[in-house]
Amino acid sequence: MTIEIARAADVAGGEEILAPDDWYVPAAPEALTDRRVEITGPANPAKMAIDALNSGARGWLADLEDASSPTWENIVWSIRNLRDAARGTLADTSPEGRAYAHRGDIRRPIVVTRPRGWHLPEKHVLVDGVRASGSLVDFGLHVLHTARQLLANGHGPYHYLPKLESHLEARLWNDVFTFTEDHLGLPAGSIRATVLIETIPAAFEMDEILHELRDHASGLNAGGWDHLFSLIKVFRDAGPEFVVPDRASVSMSAPFMRAYAELLVKTCHRRGAAAMGGMAAFVPDRADPEVTAAAIEKVRADEQREAHDGFDGSWVAHPDLVEEAERLREEVPPDRFTTHFEPAARLIAEICLADALVDFLTLPAYELLE
């Protein structure tokens, strides 16, 4: 019943483009082969960007979306800071006169920039009198000012793509990437993208999204909180069987969230892509050891669960959590799902997982809220 309701809500449809099993995304560039722990944070102010660069994380999600207020000044400064970071010249001075810069004795993280989503306009850039998409403004400015330097550094113009709802949006991004490489003289396939699967329509099209990105695909990310919001939004009028408990009571251990995570990992590893876990959104307090201990314990639980689920890496929100997350990743190697088994068995397993994506009835008892 649930899968039929999902199809009626237009979240499980899509083109039948994936009959062959023998396709894979290209091998990850060397800079993206180890993504065990990535730190997230804005690219402006410069001090926060420098903190991310000095965190010791494998990667830095330089966030122009959720972690950044989309004012024009903020966007421009973010791009400037990313340019200077690529050049190795990013520096800042506090009002008290303290200087900050990237430390040469610490591993420099690979920068993976997240532009705004397609739905957010940029009023300061008009195309034929119409506001441009903030996603294209952010991507275009970033690639124009950093791509060649990043490639010279042995990295590349790598991006996270947020809020996709369809493989058609991935197709559009692929066209944008190809156009950009052609017009800027960048090597084909040097622009790489990891797609956030944070809407229920995208959860039904993970294979299609990777297929559309083709040579520009790097992986998928499980954006659990946004995915849960998408479920609530899409099925808000679908009837009592689609009522979920208070959001704070629904964790990644809920059956429909487990199905989402498992299907993402299976899809990525079958296609040779990286499966990135979600945010460990707990922040330590250097002035309060008890708060810090609680945050580390929650991060430990998240990291262990994701490693056992087969995720290749995950995010943390604070530099003080990087070392603990790295240590846990070394302790618990990922249990990768097999990429080779009988097509019929795989199809049955994935139909069951797809059905479970919208099965809100199989939930433990929760306290009812007034």
How would you label these PLM feature ranges?
Residues 56:
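Conserved functional loop/turn residues at catalytic and ligand-binding sites
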Residues 5-25, 29-30, 39-44, 48-53, ...:
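Conserved alpha/beta-domain cores
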Residues 72, 76-89:
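Active-site-surrounding "flap" and adjacent substrate/cofactor-binding loops of secreted or lumenal enzymes
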